[in-house]
Amino acid sequence: MSMVALEWGDCFNETKEVIESWLSIFGATMERAEQLAPDFPKKMRSYEFIEFGPGLGGAAQLYSRYYNARGTLFDLPEVTNLRSIIYRALSRKKNTHASFEQFTNFDELSQKVKKTNKINFISTWAFTESPMEVRESFFEILNSSQTIMIISNAKFGEIDNFAYLKNLEQRLQHHIHISCDLSYLEKAPGYQKSHQLHIFVQKDY
């Protein structure tokens, strides 16, 4: 993973300190997720994940390496175009990086998911910073996911995100829901005390 981070940092001319901080946050979040839900890594490993709102795609590279998993990314067209430019730059530098299917159209993503055996869903902030109609369109994808990892702030506009996630728990009847605050990131830059990590894991029957 450190090699991926160093290559990413080289692409953006980031300092070693920034890269180390980024890796530390990623590692702490994965460690906390696995503490909360011991089945989380088993269900993530070697299967496909969807990341909603991956931004520039750095975390997706780490998820892919850490869990040996194939990634599918969903984002706004302008962000997807920018990310594609970055990935091409990484390729020109002959850096080792994972390739992802990228979608900006929900219907196309939905058709792809229907053909996928087992999926996982990840979103750090972006999903609960989306309108309710967007969230609702993803319900069947969430319901069919082995694991769901969402980091969320407390509110988006007038929407109470934590109440939304509690309601999602009631609707995802085949999943176990565990959540915690982000105190494990207390020393990280930009630490947000009021934000939360939510994990949903499909029950084994």
Q: Which residues are covered by each model-predicted region?
A:
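Conserved SAM-binding loop of SAM-dependent methyltransferases across substrates and taxa
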Residues: 56-67
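A short SAM/SAH-binding and catalytic strip from SAM-dependent methyltransferases
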Residues: 120-133
